[in-house]
């Protein structure tokens, strides 16, 4: 619980930080009011005269409204255009289901504009229904039943509208034929249906979805009115689609144009197939609401299309087709009670979302389309339309429409990327007669620049002059410590005593250096500061002049600085790698390395030059070194050699002195006698142990019992077998020959 309580303030802080960051005004490369308002939705411009001080850039005028007010700009001088929408009230509201008719939106990049669209459902004045049926061999039973439904269908349409009309078309062997234009004559509808015959083939009518698109786009041929439009497809077969990212695998894609010639669909030589995108687009574009009536075994297959086609209704066809009229009634009730608000194609820099407030009390904000269900006649629903732009744009138009209904809203979008400033032409004298006053700043004539057009440029603009007062594009003009006058920085006088500001960009001063003993550069007697660096007087060194130049602490007893293996800094040795402070005299482990030179010592002692080639870094000395000793080393013969190593200053070569005499251990007679005695004792002990073991074994053997006396033989043993000898045959033959 404590962790949750701790987390809440953190989350609140993060939200506050995000809100604060969203209100920041980024004003890179801003020099005019237009640049300012285009740089971000939170930026405003102050057009007050003389708002900036001497040398201050015009970008100071660009900031958030709150910051500009704090800087002394009053609200009357703020230029801060806001996105807004103006709706044109509909004088014919009672005759329309969707209002308003027109909306004009003024849109500033990054700042949303909102407006409301109301939809009120009324009874339809006109409903057109086109009946499209697949007539493959398997449709014989359905055709017979549908042929008697003409009056029932028209009666169903007139129940839901003031004027209903029906039309008919068929699909036979992948070919669509438009048979009856939309009409209010149910008898004619029935007569045309009775003329139809099913195909003798049982093949699937593969062109049925292409026929759906032809019905949708051939407006004149079908006879669609500006009212509610329904397309009923009755089929007992699967569908085929062109290859796209959703469904289907075929390759020949329809061109989306009307190809009816005297009622017959004329393809381009090979069958065309619709993609889901084409199908949904053409139905929505022409405001046609599809109803697909299929047998129960095909319902799940066709329901896949509902994901991609808005307001598509799938009905289950009974075995005797008697429920077609009721399916149409149910589909109309369902489709008419669902209101889906959508818009035509818009450029990618514009974004439109919808907040839906439905009649049943539900709401659905921030969606790419408006959506309310359960809308009954005379119910009103409201949609809030939100539109934003990512950048400045040209004038745009788009339309908002409720799918399945003819009414639409025309939206005109205009960019807010220019400043509407106060008239200031009377203040042209502030520009020295060489420019005009606009939005609080001088717009200089060609050849002049500067805050008051006081600089004669022969080409460079005011912005170019300001650029010469910056070290780089990311730096502040004159480092924020000076004024840019005609392209040159005039540095301010500091209010801190003895502080001086100077440099081409006012980037230098005489105080921002390292300190020693609480003073800049150790005080004036040690050095002085210039542009962030200490310049020391004679006798002092160091980044803060903290060190004296004396080297007494770096000299060894031979008066060599750091023993030649380092440098003296601040009277202390900084030793080279491998040498030890304080005077860099010996390497770490120097005495341990004596043993490494033992073989060289013996080699040099024996004066065997050929064997001593690996001792190139040793210099043999005949003179012993004072106070330089090494422990002695012993060889395999027991002789001890004493030698001394010495490394001179400023050299990596060791000198070696080897003591002339070898100390070898001598073997005395007493030592020999002791060795003999020990050997004899060990031999006697071995013989005694052997005899004792032998006697014990003999005694154990004598105690074993004897059966049958000493005459016992192997033949008496239970496992013994008498050997059997057979005389070789060759021996007998040999005797016979003899």
From Swiss-Prot:
Residues 1-22 form the signal peptide. Monomer and homodimer. Unlike integrin beta chains, no alpha chain partner has yet been found. Keywords: Cell membrane, Disulfide bond, EGF-like domain, Glycoprotein, Inflammatory response, Integrin, Membrane, Repeat, Signal, Transmembrane, Transmembrane helix. This is Integrin beta-2-like protein. The human orthologous protein seems not to exist. Belongs to the integrin beta chain family. N-glycosylated. Disruption phenotype: Mice display normal neutrophil maturation and function including appropriate migration into sites of inflammation and response to bacterial infection. Following inflammatory stimulus in the peritoneal cavity, they display decreased levels of Cxcl13 due to the migration of resident Cxcl13-expressing macrophages from the peritoneal cavity during the inflammatory response. Residues 710-719 have a biased composition (Polar residues). The chain crosses the membrane at residues 672-692. Residues 709-738 are annotated as: Disordered. It comes from the Eukaryota. One of its GO terms (cellular component) is secretory granule.
């Amino acid at each position: 619980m404590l962790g949750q309580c701790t987390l809440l303030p953190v989350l609140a802080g993060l939200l506050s930080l995000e809100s604060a960051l969203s209100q920041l005004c980024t004003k890179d490369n801003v020099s005019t009011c237009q640049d300012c308002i285009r740089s971000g939705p939170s930026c405003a411009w102050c057009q007050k005269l003389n708002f900036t001080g001497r040398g201050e850039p015009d970008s100071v005028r660009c900031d958030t409204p709150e910051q500009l007010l704090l800087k002394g700009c009053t609200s009357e001088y703020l230029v801060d255009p806001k996105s807004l929408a103006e709706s044109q009230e509909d004088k014919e509201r009672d005759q329309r289901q969707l209002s308003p008719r027109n909306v004009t939106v003024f849109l500033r990049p990054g700042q949303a504009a909102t407006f409301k669209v109301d939809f009120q459902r009324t009874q339809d004045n006109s409903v057109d229904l086109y009946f499209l049926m697949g007539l493959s061999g398997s449709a014989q039973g359905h055709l017979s039943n549908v042929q008697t439904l003409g009056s029932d269908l028209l009666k169903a349409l007139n129940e839901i509208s003031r004027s209903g009309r029906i039309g008919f078309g068929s699909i036979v062997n992948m070919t669509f034929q438009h048979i009856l234009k939309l009409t209010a004559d149910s008898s004619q509808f029935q007569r045309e249906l009775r003329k139809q015959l099913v195909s003798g083939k049982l093949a699937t009518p593969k062109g049925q979805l292409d026929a759906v698109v032809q019905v949708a786009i051939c407006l004149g041929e079908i006879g669609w009115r500006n009212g509610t439009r329904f397309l009923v497809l009755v089929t007992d077969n699967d569908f085929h689609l062109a290859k796209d990212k959703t469904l289907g695998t075929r390759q020949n894609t329809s061109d989306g144009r009307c190809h009816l010639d005297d009622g017959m669909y004329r393809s381009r030589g090979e069958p065309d197939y619709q993609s889901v995108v084409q199908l949904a687009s053409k139905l929505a574009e022409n405001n046609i609401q599809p109803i697909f009536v299929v047998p129960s075994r095909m319902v799940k297959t066709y329901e896949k299309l509902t994901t991609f086609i808005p307001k598509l209704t799938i009905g289950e066809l009974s075995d005797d087709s008697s429920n077609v009229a009721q399916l149409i009634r149910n589909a109309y009730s369902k489709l008419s009670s669902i209101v889906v608000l959508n818009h035509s194609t818009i450029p990618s820099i514009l974004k439109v979302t919808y907040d839906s407030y439905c009649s049943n009390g539900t709401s659905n904000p921030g969606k790419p389309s408006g959506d309310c269900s359960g809308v009954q006649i005379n119910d009103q629903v409201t949609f809030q339309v939100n539109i934003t732009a990512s950048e400045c744009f040209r004038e745009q138009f788009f339309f908002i429409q409720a799918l399945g209904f003819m009414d639409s809203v025309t939206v005109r979008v205009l960019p807010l990327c220019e400043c509407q400033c106060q008239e200031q032409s009377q203040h042209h004298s502030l520009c020295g007669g060489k420019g005009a006053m606009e939005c609080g700043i001088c717009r200089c004539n060609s050849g002049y620049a500067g805050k008051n057009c006081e600089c004669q440029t022969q080409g460079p603009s005011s912005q170019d002059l300001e650029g010469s007062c910056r070290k780089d594009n990311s730096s502040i003009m004159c480092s924020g410590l000076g004024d840019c006058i005609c392209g040159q920085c005039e540095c301010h006088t500091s209010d801190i005593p003895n502080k001086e500001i100077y440099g081409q960009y006012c980037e230098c001063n005489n105080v921002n250096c390292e300190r020693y003993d609480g003073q800049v550069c150790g005080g004036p007697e040690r050095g002085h500061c210039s542009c962030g660096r200490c310049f020391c007087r004679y006798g002092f060194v160091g980044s803060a002049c903290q060190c004296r130049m004396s080297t007494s602490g770096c000299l060894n007893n031979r008066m060599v600085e750091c023993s030649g293996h380092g440098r003296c800094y601040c009277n202390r040795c900084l030793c080279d790698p491998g040498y030890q402070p304080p005077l860099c005299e010996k390497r770490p482990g120097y005495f341990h390395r004596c043993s490494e030179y033992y073989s060289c010592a013996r080699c040099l002692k024996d004066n065997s030059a050929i064997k001593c080639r690996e001792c190139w870094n040793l210099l043999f000395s005949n003179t012993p070194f004072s106070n330089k000793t090494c422990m002695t080393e012993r060889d395999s013969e027991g002789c001890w050699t004493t030698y001394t190593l010495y490394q001179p200053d400023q050299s990596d070569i060791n000198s070696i002195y080897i003591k002339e005499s070898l100390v070898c251990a001598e073997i005395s007679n007493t030592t020999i006698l002791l060795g003999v005695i020990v050997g004899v004792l060990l031999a006697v002990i071995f013989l005694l142990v052997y005899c004792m073991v032998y006697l014990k074994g003999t005694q154990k053997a004598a105690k074993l019992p004897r059966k049958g006396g000493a005459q016992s033989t192997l033949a008496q043993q239970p496992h013994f077998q008498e050997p059997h000898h057979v005389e070789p045959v060759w021996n007998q033959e040999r005797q016979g020959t003899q």
